[in-house]
Amino acid sequence: MTDNDGQKDFSEAAAENAGSKPGEPRVSKPYIMPDDPEETPSEALVKEAAEAKDRMLRTLAEMENLRKRTQREVADARAYGIAGFARDVLEIADNLQRALDAVPAEARAAADPGLTALIEGVELTERSLHRALEKNGVKKLDAAGEKFDPNIHQAMFEVPDNSVPPGTVVQVIQTGYMIGDRVLRPALVGVSKAEPKPAA
């Protein structure tokens, strides 16, 4: 047995132990870092404090949004809470106006004192009712002569009329009303349209 044989035996043994063939270089396994190294207690506290601050800021933002929404709802309730009642009262105003319109002008001029007092009483009641409505934010729409607006007017018919621009309200059938900036009841109107030109 020579020294070369000893060296050969030693290298063969080392190769077998390493699981590789003789003459191949030996490769060691790389060190792999753990995926989630353990946090130190101070890092955990900092992370927990940041999460708590984030939750607190979100809660404060939600509370502020809730406060603003509640204020809007309260303001709307104050402004529009009487809408249903006001709509019912408008029928009374319409009936008072119909009663006044039912008396012809000639009958008013030649009326006896009893009829004159009745007409004045109905007019006074109508004015009083409109004042009460205005006091509560309900305003009358004066539609006659205005440009037709589908947001506040409801067209019932068209009237051929070249004396005004097409799309102008020429007749009001039923008065419209607003409550705040909302339409309580649209005005029922007749709208002008251009008269057809005669055929030549």
Swiss-Prot record:
It is found in: Cytoplasm. One of its GO terms (biological process) is protein folding. It comes from the Bacteria. InterPro entries: GrpE, GrpE_coiled_coil, GrpE_head. CDD domains: GrpE. The keyword Cytoplasm applies. SUPFAM superfamilies: Coiled-coil domain of nucleotide exchange factor GrpE, Head domain of nucleotide exchange factor GrpE. The keyword Cytoplasm applies. Keywords: Chaperone, Cytoplasm, Stress response. GO terms for cellular component: cytoplasm. Pfam families: GrpE. PROSITE patterns: GRPE. GO terms for molecular function: adenyl-nucleotide exchange factor activity; protein homodimerization activity; protein-folding chaperone binding; unfolded protein binding. Residues 1-11 have a biased composition (Basic and acidic residues). Residues 1-43 are annotated as: Disordered. Participates actively in the response to hyperosmotic and heat shock by preventing the aggregation of stress-denatured proteins, in association with DnaK and GrpE. It is the nucleotide exchange factor for DnaK and may function as a thermosensor. Unfolded proteins bind initially to DnaJ; upon interaction with the DnaJ-bound protein, DnaK hydrolyzes its bound ATP, resulting in the formation of a stable complex. GrpE releases ADP from DnaK; ATP binding to DnaK triggers the release of the substrate protein, thus completing the reaction cycle. NCBIfam families: PRK14140.1, PRK14141.1. Belongs to the GrpE family. Homodimer. This is Protein GrpE. It comes from Afipia carboxidovorans (strain ATCC 49405 / DSM 1227 / KCTC 32145 / OM5). The lineage of its organism: Bacteria, Pseudomonadati, Pseudomonadota, Alphaproteobacteria, Hyphomicrobiales. The gene is grpE.
